[in-house]
C-alpha cells in the first residue's frame, strides 16, 4: 500500500552517537537585511524575505512588462 512505510535500515549507518551529541555554537550570526522577513507580518502574512519577494517578480518576468509597455508606446 502507498500509505505504508518501508524501512530498510540504511539511514542507521549515517547517524552515530557523535553526530547525535553534536551541538551548534550559540553565537550571533550576521544576516543580510534583504534576507530578513518583513517586520510587519500583520499586512497579509507573507513570510518571504525581501530577496524572495524580488525573485517572485523575476520568476514571473513581470519586470519586463513595464519595459515592453514603455517601448511599444514610443
Swiss-Prot record:
Record's protein name: Anaphase-promoting complex subunit 13
Signal peptide annotation: none
Organism expressing this protein natively: Xenopus tropicalis (Western clawed frog)
Known role: Component of the anaphase promoting complex/cyclosome (APC/C), a cell cycle-regulated E3 ubiquitin ligase that controls progression through mitosis and the G1 phase of the cell cycle. The APC/C complex acts by mediating ubiquitination and subsequent degradation of target proteins: it mainly mediates the formation of 'Lys-11'-linked polyubiquitin chains and, to a lower extent, the formation of 'Lys-48'- and 'Lys-63'-linked polyubiquitin chains. The APC/C complex catalyzes assembly of branched 'Lys-11'-/'Lys-48'-linked branched ubiquitin chains on target proteins.
Record localization: Nucleus
Pathway linked to the protein: Protein modification; protein ubiquitination
Gene Ontology BP, a term: cell division
Subunit structure as annotated in this protein's UniProt entry: The APC/C is composed of at least 12 subunits.
Sorted UniProt keywords: Cell cycle, Cell division, Mitosis, Nucleus, Ubl conjugation pathway
Pfam families: Apc13p (PF05839)
InterPro entries noted in UniProt: Apc13
Record-stated family: Belongs to the APC13 family.
GO cellular component terms, A-Z: anaphase-promoting complex
Major site of localization recorded for this protein: nucleus
Amino acid at each position: 500500500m502507498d500509505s505504508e512505510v518501508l524501512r530498510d535500515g540504511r539511514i542507521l549507518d549515517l547517524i552515530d552517537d557523535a553526530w547525535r551529541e553534536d551541538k551548534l555554537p550559540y553565537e550571533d550570526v550576521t544576516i543580510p537585511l534583504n534576507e530578513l522577513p518583513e517586520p510587519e507580518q500583520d499586512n497579509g502574512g507573507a513570510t518571504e524575505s525581501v530577496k524572495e519577494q524580488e525573485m517572485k517578480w523575476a520568476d514571473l518576468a513581470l519586470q519586463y512588462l513595464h519595459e515592453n509597455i514603455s517601448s511599444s508606446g514610443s
